[in-house]
């Protein structure tokens, strides 16, 4: 499948967040190529979104968010877990999509070796920190161009048929913005990090 072009990311973030479901996230490692089907995302949109890192303006940490769409924004949470975001919308507008979970489709043995505590297929990348661990995504990739066939990129894939939209996870501090239904996941995937209430 072809690598997604920059135009894919240069669109409203909510559209990109939904359309990334079903696409293939690829990481080229010394041990070989590993790939995940993206099954869960979250949208973070601009300085008016209190859950967004850009809500208080540009900093050294979030500078990539203000740049060109189609680049990786990687940051650390809890001092130990990396999180991968893909920058969206026009250059200068801070928005991105967090890749929350993925389903292993290639190089599962390599990913399992990077996440030895994950004993089952659906546990390998069922969360943003787990996903980055399984694909060896670190802050060294912050700012990487995912529209080029380099170390990290996204390939096209079939659209997801049933998408669940619900509030984002871990953003209670954001007030009313915490209630926005800006988390999206593939209803039929067993690899999502957490299902919405009532979705069994």
UniProtKB/Swiss-Prot annotation:
Its EC number is 3.2.2.-. Gene3D superfamilies: Methylpurine-DNA glycosylase (MPG) (3.10.300.10). This is Putative 3-methyladenine DNA glycosylase. Keywords: DNA damage, DNA repair, Hydrolase. Pfam families: Pur_DNA_glyco. Transmembrane segments: none annotated. It is an enzyme of class 3 (hydrolase). CDD domains: AAG. One of its GO terms (biological process) is base-excision repair. InterPro entries: Formyl_transferase-like_C_sf, MPG, MPG_sf. GO terms for molecular function: alkylbase DNA N-glycosylase activity; DNA binding. Belongs to the DNA glycosylase MPG family. PANTHER family: DNA-3-METHYLADENINE GLYCOSYLASE.
